[in-house]
Amino acid sequence: MESQYNAAEIEQKWQQDWVNQGLDKTPENSDKPKFYALSMFPYPSGNLHMGHVRNYVITDVIARLKRLQGYRVLHPMGWDAFGLPAENAAIDRNIPPADWTYKNIAQMKQQLQTLGLSIDWDREVATCSPDYYKWTQWLFLQFYQAGLAYQKEAAVNWDPIDQTVLANEQVDSEGYSWRSGAKVERKLLRQWFFKITDYAEQLLTDLDKLTGWPDRVKLMQENWIGKSVGAYLEFPVKGSEEKIAVFTTRPDTVYGVTYVVLAPEHPLTPKVTTEGQKEAVEAFIEEVSNESEIERTAEDKPKRGILTGGTAVNPFNGEEIPILIADYVLYEYGTGAVMGVPAHDTRDFKFATEKELPIKVVIVPENSEDNNPTLTEAYTEPGIMVNSGEFNGMQSTEGKTAIINYAEKQGYGKARIQYRLRDWLISRQRYWGCPIPVVHCPSCGTVAVPDADLPVKLPENVEFTGRGASPLAKMEDWINVPCPSCGEPAKRETDTMDTFIDSSWYYLRYTDAMNDQEAFKLEKANDWMNVDQYVGGIEHAILHLLYSRFFTKVLRDRGLVNVDEPFKRLLTQGMVQAMAYKNPKTGKYIPVDKVNPESPKDPDTGDDLEVFYEKMSKSKYNGVDPQKVLGKYGADTARMFILFKAPPEKDLEWDDADVEGQFRFLNRVWRLVNGYEKKQGEVISNKELSKEEKDLRRAIHTAIKEISEDLEGDYQFNTAVSELMKLSNALNDAKCINSEVYQEGIETLLILLAPFAPHIAEELWHNLGHETSIHLETWPQVDPDALVVDEITLVIQIMGKTRGTIQVPANSSKEELEKLARESDIGQRNLDGKEVKKVIVVPGKLVNFVVPK
């Protein structure tokens, strides 16, 4: 056996051996209980970063643990491989997106393998492979057949110089194109949507089923879905047959409406605008149309609006109220119109004050003597209805129902539930995405591509310029095809799908990844689903996780799966942070290697630098290359540091000294095990053990108990590693090295260590003479008898002051404890010749003698 711990040598050796043994392959046809452990798959950027390492190491520890605990484990990996960066690479480097992507996949896969991850690579998927996106297209057609995929016009970001559509991430915070520098415009295009709103209520109520998800994530989804209970009310337009429909959660304030506001894009806007206001309104619409939704609705931005000249009528009191348009009202939300109640809505109060619009109080606090107070801010609390006709004096909470009932009887309103969630826009005017499998025929309209003709493959030899229409729209040979229905000339859809679609079902493909006849067999999906433990970043709390839940429910309704939810438990790991240095005067970050950490100054200006932990990134110059860490210390040390430094859900602060500390710990384990001479003997029996052996065995089984508990539920890896260190120290300090208990301790230490540091555990296991892999062993079980304490430490006090301690039998009665304390050397020395007035005995802890002063 090696005298020195050579991480690189043993890690390379065992990684190859595990491949040769097929140790990580997913067991089929096993009667063991199943466990599906899954990390969110990465975009193949080409380089692994520490955030990746943390994610995949966490999942790997869980997968390895569950195998040791007797589960058959599915632990796959793949690549979320479509997306904009590949097209940018094609433009900037003149490389086909596929070449760039597959090169990056190969590079990242090799980096992942050096971490010693127990991944079943036979199930590897890449979403850009026709073998995968054939089934993405097939699933799109399932949605289409179910009436859940449709087309309508929607706004996109348009670069007027490059004459191309831009993704949101290609537009800077000021609204300019990142490539051409042009001011980005908003343009309407006909695009594809998925009807996720049909599932809004299910997506909301089923959050209650997700008991293994962080409350924070569930709350984020709940807010995103945004259920509101209220009323749909109609305000007639004066001098017209038109009516303005609004949704409100405060129908009790309807008598306080002093204006209504339309979205600039609302179809009624031109109809209600008077001739005198036409020019101003059109100019306002032009100005607003080029702003993003985020810009228009930002809370810290002043709300802008303009009078249309039109007038509406409040049907409840007959009052005439002005009609405005404003930037903060979006046509896609609700009805595209809102009623203004400035007395009882904070935003409306500010807007009305700036526009000098009337403010009418209709709710006052209970016991208020003034029904028409002058307000300095909106009153938004419940209260008593006033200035509200027949509803005066009613509690506002009761008034909501009363107003709705009245509106329904009168025919100008009804109860309604509304959701903030909008249908999912899935169209992308991009090349490097999954083609939408439909054909547009002049005679037949939109026609689905038959299943037999899938996949619709992306054409090759495409020119990427970054200008003009999507590259697909220029591929005439690819676009022009016969209609699948009538055979006449037709054109393919040139939009590709949002990459979130690819990641909304990949967890199902893993259950049957090599199937070339189906997306997945129902039996296999039902066998493995749900994912038992999903691990990924909090940044995916809403879109990816919500879309995956939506997909699962649709596929359930299509008879393709038997589960309601895709992910049983969710762990959102924290970020990996490192020290960053920033010049507060210039705002520039300074590379870590150019700063003296003991006296951090800007090397160019001499200015003192701000020093703080921040998420690792290229722009902050504080990234740590995983390959350098692995090269210096090995994968096991990197894994141990990642797991020990912080609880998995918390942010982790990188510290080279702590990495070094984990390396030293593994070296201690190496020396400890290799210094042990293995002895054969009889089965352990507590009755035959010496006190020292019992103490050591108690330490062994305490470690088993504590680590097993740490790895259940919340996965507190950091405290589990601490317990490994305690056990290592106990073994290092033990004198009974030739005993069977010591042998049990050494082997237990290695099995407990195996999920965390799999390579060194395997090497040392074989050094002990074992011929089969440690990863095929069984997780050790706690022996309750070993935890029983024969003796305890008893504190002896005189007048409340500690005079010393003695060892006593653990099961001693109060009387026995007093007797043992009196008869001890400490007792005799301190009580000699003194009268004991009182004795206080705290069983298992102390005896306190009260004596006269």
UniProtKB/Swiss-Prot annotation:
Any one GO cellular component localisation term in the record? cytosol
Would you kindly state one Gene Ontology biological process term found in this protein's UniProt entry?
leucyl-tRNA aminoacylation
Fetch the Gene3D superfamilies from UniProt.
Answer: HUPs (3.40.50.620), Isoleucyl-tRNA Synthetase, Domain 1 (1.10.730.10)
- Major location, coarse class? cytoplasm
Kindly report, in one word, the top-level EC class recorded for this enzyme. ligase
Residues annotated for ATP binding in this entry? K618
Which compartments does it reside in?
Cytoplasm
InterPro entries in the cross-refs = aa-tRNA-synth_I_CS (IPR001412), aa-tRNA-synth_Ia (IPR002300), Leu-tRNA-ligase (IPR002302), Leu_tRNA-synth_edit (IPR025709), M/V/L/I-tRNA-synth_anticd-bd (IPR013155), Methionyl/Leucyl_tRNA_Synth (IPR015413), Rossmann-like_a/b/a_fold (IPR014729), tRNAsynth_Ia_anticodon-bd (IPR009080)
- Molecular function as annotated in GO: aminoacyl-tRNA deacylase activity; ATP binding; leucine-tRNA ligase activity
Return the EC number: 6.1.1.4
Q: Which CDD domains match?
A: Anticodon_Ia_Leu_BEm, LeuRS_core
Q: What NCBIfam families does its record include?
A: leuS_bact
| Name of the protein described by the UniProt record | Leucine--tRNA ligase
What gene, per UniProt, encodes this protein? leuS
